Curated annotation (Swiss-Prot):
Its main location: cytoplasm. InterPro entries: DAP_epimerase_AS (IPR018510), DAP_epimerase_DapF (IPR001653). The lineage of its organism: Bacteria, Bacillati, Cyanobacteriota, Cyanophyceae, Oscillatoriophycideae. Keywords: Amino-acid biosynthesis, Cytoplasm, Isomerase, Lysine biosynthesis. PANTHER family: DIAMINOPIMELATE EPIMERASE, DIAMINOPIMELATE EPIMERASE, CHLOROPLASTIC. It is found in: Cytoplasm. Transmembrane segments: none annotated. GO terms for molecular function: diaminopimelate epimerase activity. This is Diaminopimelate epimerase. One of its GO terms (cellular component) is cytosol.
Amino acid sequence: MKIPFTKYQGLGNDFILIDNRHSPEPLITAEMAVAMCDRHFGIGADGVIFALPGQAETDYTMRIFNSDGSEPEMCGNGIRCLAQFIARLEANNAIGRTYRIHTLAGTIIPRLEANEQVTVDMGPPQLLGSEIPTTLVKGSEKVLAVPLEVEGKDWLVTCVSMGNPHCVTFVGDLASIPLETIGPKFEHHPVFPQRTNVEFVEVIAPDYMKMRVWERGAGITLACGTGACAVVVAALLTGKCDRRCTVELPGGCLQIHWSQTDNRVYMTGPAKAVFEGIYPI
């Protein structure tokens, strides 16, 4: 079997996009996705995204396998790439075009903008311990600057779910964080029963922050859209930033707005096609 695909990237967070509109189940298995994502023996990517038929009054369904074969609820950079991929499939990239996309995190609505930008309505953040989920606090409590012991040190963490779990820590010197070694310690900490994404953040100004991310199931990546959203929510809740903020990641910048009017988080950033190909299974 030969699988046509298009490689996309959003701020260096890269994905293999597959046209799966004719079937409600992914064309390939999680194990096959791992092989495709291998950067030495495969195509190379942080994940494989499938454009499946819509359900529950949506236009499309998004499924994604991470590079380790796990399946996350949603991916912010990935859904921007999916929106551009759908526009290419439909041969309609009109500015302002929106799609209702079913994900495991609920319905997400991306909108095409000029210059290959996509704005995504990421929905409202979830803040309770039971929603993250985490056992760090009671299920009815929020996790705001709560100590978490990792590697013998107490880190003040704020937890947010953007449909997937995030553990945010604010630091004074982002470059000093040994992300490759400490990231997996946070991800697999026993207080996170479904594991967690991990963000370390340095606040530069109330409207500008820098972050590095260890993604659940993917490790260090150049960008994480849901992570950037979670960072702005966490920073605002702890008095560190404005509702509109630029978040700088290793791969570039995202514009994040946590609306006071409707409590929803909006993310704007690029998504670009890299190349097309056919992968033999």
